[in-house]
Amino acid sequence: MAEDLSIITGSKQEQYQSLLPQIKGLLDGETDLVANLANTVAALKEQFGWLWVGFYIVKKSFDYAQDELVLGPFQGPVACTRIRKGKGVCGSSWVEAKTLIVPDVEKFPGHIACSSISKSEIVVPVIRNGNVIAVLDVDSEELDQFDTTDQFFLEKIVELISF
């Protein structure tokens, strides 16, 4: 597939239905993880225009006894580099191994404010062999931006990525 996206307007579901096979086309045959994560976030950011889209990858910590989430490929304003397990929305999604939709980040206990512009968030864990190995984090400057449609399609998108 050419490295171009066909950006469409329409309902959120229609946009995802158009984007999903395009992301699959970008990932097919590419084995480099960074390239695949980068193209995935670029495609999502280009289609939806969200404030921030990126991955945090579970890695060994140099100065902390446990693994932590380390910033991976992203698009948007500069971001927090490391997140400990159980901290913030990303760390909570990691611990719970489930997608978290946060309509208002100010009301999420322990929210880590990497950007004061962010108003709502969805975090989707990437699970392989029963373990969370990364999370996809998406932030919006609008309250209540994300719903179960986003959850359904973003979970499908992270399943496409080979780790």
Positions of predicted regions on the chain:
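Intrinsically disordered, low-complexity terminal regulatory regions
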Residues: 1-73
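Juxtadomain coupling helices with adjacent low-complexity linkers
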Residues: 2, 20, 24, 140-163
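Short loop/turn motifs at secondary-structure junctions and domain boundaries
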Residues: 47, 113-118
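Short hydrophobic/aromatic beta-strand element in the GNAT-like acyltransferase core
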Residues: 52, 123, 135
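A short, aliphatic-rich beta-strand micro-motif
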Residues: 120-127
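Sensory-domain boundary capping and coupling elements
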Residues: 127-140
